[in-house]
Amino acid sequence: MSWRSESIWIEFITGSRKTSNFCWAFILFLGSLGFLLVGTSSYLGRNVISLFPSQQIIFFPQGIVMSFYGIAGLFISCYLWCTILWNVGSGYDLFDRKEGIVRIFRWGFPGKSRRIFLRFLMKDIQSIRIEVKEGVSARRVLYMEIRGQGAIPLIRTDENFTTREIEQKAAELAYFLRVPIEVF
């Protein structure tokens, strides 16, 4: 999603609050909870939940392994829910031609670097770079090449843009910033 005027372009970044992250966190939570309950049932020797008969699973080694997988899955699920709650990775890219400044803001994990704020002069932008790797694990990334800073990614690698959409976005941004496009 973006907003544009004659001299300002704001590109809003989604971050971790995407439908796929909600689905994975929910599925992982339910699956790991099931594993932990089956492991606990095998330890106690009685059914904690009626779906899985505990007599079929002995505690050593199957019950221990299932309990371990359940606990590990709950930790990973907790991590996913925290990234969703904190909306890690969301933010905006602001390009202001009137002031000649580019501002990039992202939310990070809580702590010292919770707010990631980068500011550059437009005259320091060398180019807009497109990196396209086709194949099984296709990767399409849009970078902004800054003099003395290197390349800064503007579009996340997990966003499923087609090559045409990336090229269109790069062309529009390069035209707005009045810089060349490089393709790798």
Curated annotation (Swiss-Prot):
Highest taxon, organism lineage: Eukaryota
Listed GO biological process terms: photosynthesis
Source organism (scientific name): Lepidium virginicum (Virginia pepperweed)
Name under which the protein is recorded: Photosystem I assembly protein Ycf4
Any Pfam family matching the protein: Ycf4
Bilayer topology annotation: Multi-pass membrane protein
Location of this chain's protein in the cell: Plastid, Chloroplast thylakoid membrane
HAMAP family per UniProt: Ycf4
KW Methyltransferase (keyword) present: no
Record function comment: Seems to be required for the assembly of the photosystem I complex.
Transmembrane intervals: 22-42, 57-77
Any one Gene Ontology cellular component term annotated for this protein: photosystem I
Keywords (A to Z) from UniProt: Chloroplast, Membrane, Photosynthesis, Plastid, Thylakoid, Transmembrane, Transmembrane helix
Family in the record: Belongs to the Ycf4 family.
